[in-house]
Amino acid sequence: MTDAYPPAFGLRTRWCGELRPSYAGEEVALCGWVARRREHGEHLAFMDLRDRTGVVQCVIDGSVDVRSEWVVRVTGTVRRRPEGTENPSLATGEAEVADCQVEVLARAEPPPFPLDERTETDETIRLRHRYVDLRRDRMQRNLRARATANAALRRSMEEQGFVEVETPLLMASTPEGARDFVVPSRLHPGRFYALPQSPQLFKQLCMVGGVDRYYQIARCVRDEDLRGNRQFEFTQLDLEASFAGQEDIIEVLTTAVRACAAKLAPSREPGDFPRMTWYDAMERYGSDKPDVRFGLELVELSELFAESGFNAFRGQCVKGIRVPGGAGLSRKRLDELTDQAKLWGAKGLVWMRVQTEALDSPVAKFLSEEELAGVRSQLEAEVGDLLLLVADKRTVVRHVLGLLRLELARPPVSEGGLQFLWIVDFPLFEDIDEDGRPVPAHHPFTMPHPDDLKLLESGSPEDLLGVRSQAYDLVLNGWELGSGSVRIVQPEIQRTVLRLVGIDEATMQQRFGFLL
């Protein structure tokens, strides 16, 4: 992000955040909000003035009546602060504005919460007074970062030959992954428009219309359950390209995201964008959006315990993780982790402390010497480590250990650099329902992997669950940034998939005839 300041308009000649000792002697006019006022004797006061660029100290007459969050215009002379009064926590901390004349532009009631970054305020209160919350430095930085990201993405997409096309906001309802928000039609009572969950059909029409390479910073709306990282409205970089495959789109997006990262975080330049299959991600990290900034990978132990005398392990999927130096965790903490694992769906959690000669564990007496030695060897355990094992169905084991590794070791988002990762080869179907039909992992319009078309034609449940799709996700430090897929363009394959999920020919023609 750039530190350059735009030209000042009208009532101001400078921005608060740009003043430095090099401006000493310059007559300036500033506009902003009163952040704080401090009395300094009977006839002198210091006022911190804030605008979107930062805060600067102004020296004012003690008789001037200004209060927190009043909007004012200040004229005065920039000077270097006296030695010993500098404020190193401010970018402007070596300068101040003296001999100030203050013009009150707007008075204000006391703010509903403090605006300094040191004070945590309940989010409900912040949202109720969002216009005040937006004045905080963090929110201003977020808005500028968002604008910088959008500009970088636009520039990169245009350099790669894509054309920005705005698509309609009012459309007919189409099958998507969530419920629609609807808008009643004034001209057609009883009928409704839907707000777009994505511009999918419109961008496909752009391809039919010869646009060839389309993109849009698109506003999307989905009526789904709210979470910390999921809201009704969101913005996405949406794109489509004709005569392109998965590798082409991944390359385009890698270029665009790299350009965006260079503008937002030039000191944290990302390295490679490695690939990992969905299966490997689930087996090694227990998640399809793994945080690869740290280890604690899941290790397969099922074969070791296939014929175990310990009933909880025998014949189950068994995996473990090694926590370096974790043997020092208290019994209370281990009990907390066990309870957490049960809440996540496990029957229990086996822990083992690695000692010089043996493994200290409540279940050690139920395991053979060969099994204990095998655990130690396969997990590459060292003295002082903690080993955590879960035995259950494979889906449960992966899920629980995947969450445990995050619970134990996930670093803050700001640490460890930018670790981008492409997840590829998602399954086309995630399960078989009670009627024996496959359940699409995403939607029934994703192109199967070309090497798995024979499995699709077989129709057996085992084969269908082995079909990979041409779907892909981009992950950053354990968070899904976005996803995409190659759509089915051959009517025969589309018919096959729709038939497999239980849609008859008449319904196909009625709902999806334009695709067939």
Language model regions located:
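Class II aminoacyl-tRNA synthetase catalytic cores and aaRS-like
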Residues: 1-516
